[in-house]
Amino acid sequence: MKKFTSKKLTAYVMAALMAGSAMLGTSFGASTAEAAVKVNPIAGISDDFIKGADVSMIPELERLGGKFYDNGVEKDCLTILQEKGINSVRVRIWNDPYSYGPNGNGGGVTDEKKALEVATRAKALGMKVLVDFHYSDWWADPGKQYPPKAWENHNAKQLAKDVYNYTAKVMKDFNAAGVTPDMVQIGNELNNGMLWPVCKTDTPEGYKALADAIAQGLKAVKDNDPNNQVIRMVHLANGNNNALYRSFFDELIVNNGVNDFDVIGFSYYPFWHGSMEELSYNMNDMVDRYGKDVIVVETAYAFTNEQGDAQKNCAGPTEEAIAGYKSTVQGQASGLHDVMEHVSNVKNGKGKGIFYWEPDWIPVEGAGWKAGEGNEWENLAMFDFQGNALESLDVFKMVSDQSKPVVEYKVKEIEAALVTGSVGQPVEMPKKVSVVYENDVVKSMPVVWENAEPVFDAAGKYTVKGTVNGVAGKTAVASINVIKKVNLVKNGTFENGDLNGWTITGDKDAVNTVSSAGDARGKSAMHYWADKGFKFKATQSFTGLKDGKYTVSCWTQGGGGQHYYTLMVQTSKGEKSAVVADTGWNDWHQWVIRDVEIKDGKATIGIDMVANAGNWGSIDDVEFYLQE
């Protein structure tokens, strides 16, 4: 396989570094002594590390009255970001967002004109520019990749031509304006392809059509880059999912021969995309397998769980419990530091940098993710709800300040574990508790309880204490709410991240657990997926049941489309079932079977599925109990 050198990428970031240091009297190594947030310098971080931000919303925010401040002084948002050490910006382009109407459909209405405006302003500040082609009139991501309305009903050959022509046009326009992009990505979060349904990766024909479209986009960039300086990227989401990245890029590079790009881009949001250790493994594997540079092109961390408008936010307490960082300014700073450190530590210097996604998206009326709706992102921005720069922005310079000592952060507290149990039944105690450090990093650590299986004879509130090895002077506490309803299912919440208590038959490899917000109602859930047709049963059997009527229930979310999918209960009288019909990611539904009569003390409950290739989803909070 052809391997690219990093010459273009090094030129990209060195130019940004030099220009950024010269602007506005700022210095890359400026003192950060006043910073209130705590982060250590990153050992070995290169001087040319990309510290970027996607700021596509800025024109719309400004048009609607949004203002930005640093230490109480109103300033241009891009100026603040540049002064804080950000050396690159990313701008997304939707082909024709006005195809939805004269005012577009929200999300910044980010057409080429707005992208060019931001790029021009950023270049004037000495910053570099990454152009993100969505090849859609609105958001393109793993869950939706619809072609521009002008390209609807085009076949694969025509779509490849469309991609070439449109990409070439934008490149020519940027060149003519004197703001040639420094980096271009062909498509956005292409897990499942783009330009659906023709270039969707659910068939070999779809993969081929996708590869042809990507190849034409890459060619259009190259044909309009006479100095061969523009870096070319292909970008996926789910940065922790090594199997996804291997299968996608094997198909693109090995099977379809599309290798004329420099960078593999990753989206990594800790509350959706697993652990940083998984991200690191995946990035290093991409370096080994394909010889590409790697960039985390989207990431973000919450600074609060409060809301700045009426729209429910993408990240809240549930996501905080998964992310590994408190939703505080310090937690945001620590999360940003850690993702930069993991990218910086990629082998052979191939980890080139990160882009924070929309740090500018403060709550401004009318600037919602969709027309008529609010902002889901304001608590993930790096400005408060009034537009004041947060101290977490200082991290971009602090990570490179090698004059600062490395500090070992101590444990601040052990968060109480909240547990629900049933009268007269052993309580399922958590195997781990959340340990919070002084820098608002949260680690899940094993706990030893004084009573590992407490049983309580009456409903009420109880506590059990425990210890965490290596954490001196702090006591773990489980706050237990004991209720009358007795859920007989073992490990029905999957909160310990395993399938203990469940019998899986059939295609076992398709079933595991998942620990990401949206895929689980709590910290973890049962999960299923396979790239080929599969079937399985997940069951629990019971004996010694009291005579009476019982209820079985579960919650599910997923893409739907299975051949057969039921919640079932088997008794001596036969089987009862409820058909499960999922309607999308994080769209949870409860399925219930009531009045299950049991007289011989025996029952089996569970999930029965016959699925098609690519079917995916989660099962959580399974209950089986005697009705009162």
Predicted regions located by residue number:
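Extracellular carbohydrate-recognition regions
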Residues: 39-55, 483-507
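Extra-cytoplasmic beta-strand recognition segments
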Residues: 53, 120, 131, 494, ...
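Extracellular glycan-recognition surfaces and repeat-rich motifs
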Residues: 76, 495-527, 531-532
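Substrate-binding cleft and catalytic face of glycoside hydrolase catalytic domains
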Residues: 80-231, 235-239
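Aromatic-rich peripheral "rim/lid" segments of glycoside hydrolase catalytic domains that contact
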Residues: 285, 304-338, 342, 346-350, ...
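Solvent-exposed, low-complexity, repeat-rich "mucin-like" stalks and linkers
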Residues: 407-441
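Serine/threonine-rich, repeat-prone extracellular segments and beta-strand-based repeat modules
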Residues: 440-474, 478-479
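Extracellular carbohydrate recognition and processing domains
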Residues: 572-602, 612-614
